[in-house]
């Protein structure tokens, strides 16, 4: 029994001694990078090997699984407000069907239901269309860049200048991710 225990203990010790050692960190090494090289270095640091591995796994899953059919929930089709918004967003929809939703004609609404089932509309496209029409008034404001804090943009520019002129470490670049 003791011999069996010692042989297993020796086996575990040998396995643990073969684990890869920690590679010395290169985070403190100064790197000089300007322009495209700086952008590539920033992408390399922020999108490390872990991200690449995750993206590869997602690609494999997409290739294996078949595309799922999207179904419009019946609660959307039964709601007259949403239905009228859907009709406005569908190009080439007959005017009769648009009027039918407003007047409440059941026969034409049933036809509409079949048209919507047969159409190649994607639920995500319909959601985007609704969100675009819903927030159309809000989008007429100034560009999105003006809303982005200027201080953060200035820090990014200062960091690129520092990496170009003086040099920066991977740790400093990682803090900007």
From Swiss-Prot:
Belongs to the insulin family. Residues 63-149 form a propeptide. Relaxin is an ovarian hormone that acts with estrogen to produce dilatation of the birth canal in many mammals. It comes from Canis lupus familiaris. GO terms for molecular function: hormone activity. This is Prorelaxin. GO terms for cellular component: extracellular region. Keywords: Cleavage on pair of basic residues, Disulfide bond, Hormone, Secreted, Signal. The gene is RLN. Heterodimer of a B chain and an A chain linked by two disulfide bonds. It comes from the Eukaryota. The keyword Lyase does not apply. Disulfide bonds join 34-164, 46-177, 163-168. PANTHER family: PRORELAXIN H2 (PTHR12004:SF13), RELAXIN (PTHR12004).
């Amino acid at each position: 029994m003791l011999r069996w225990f010692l042989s297993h203990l020796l086996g575990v010790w040998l396995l643990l001694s073969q684990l890869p050692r920690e590679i010395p960190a290169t985070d403190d090494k100064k790197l000089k990078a300007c322009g495209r090289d700086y952008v590539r270095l920033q992408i390399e640091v922020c999108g490390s090997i872990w991200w690449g591995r995750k993206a590869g796994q997602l690609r494999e899953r997409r290739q294996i699984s078949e595309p799922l059919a999207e179904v419009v929930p019946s609660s959307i089709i039964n709601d007259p407000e949403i239905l009228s918004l859907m009709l406005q967003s569908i190009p080439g929809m007959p005017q009769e069907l648009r009027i039918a939703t407003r007047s409440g004609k059941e026969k034409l609404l049933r036809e509409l239901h079949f048209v919507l089932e047969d159409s190649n509309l994607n639920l995500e496209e319909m959601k985007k269309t609704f969100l675009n029409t819903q927030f159309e008034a809000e989008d007429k404001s100034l560009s999105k860049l003006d809303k982005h804090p200027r201080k953060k943009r200035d820090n990014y520019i200062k960091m690129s200048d520092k990496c170009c002129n003086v040099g920066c470490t991977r740790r400093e670049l990682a803090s900007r991710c």
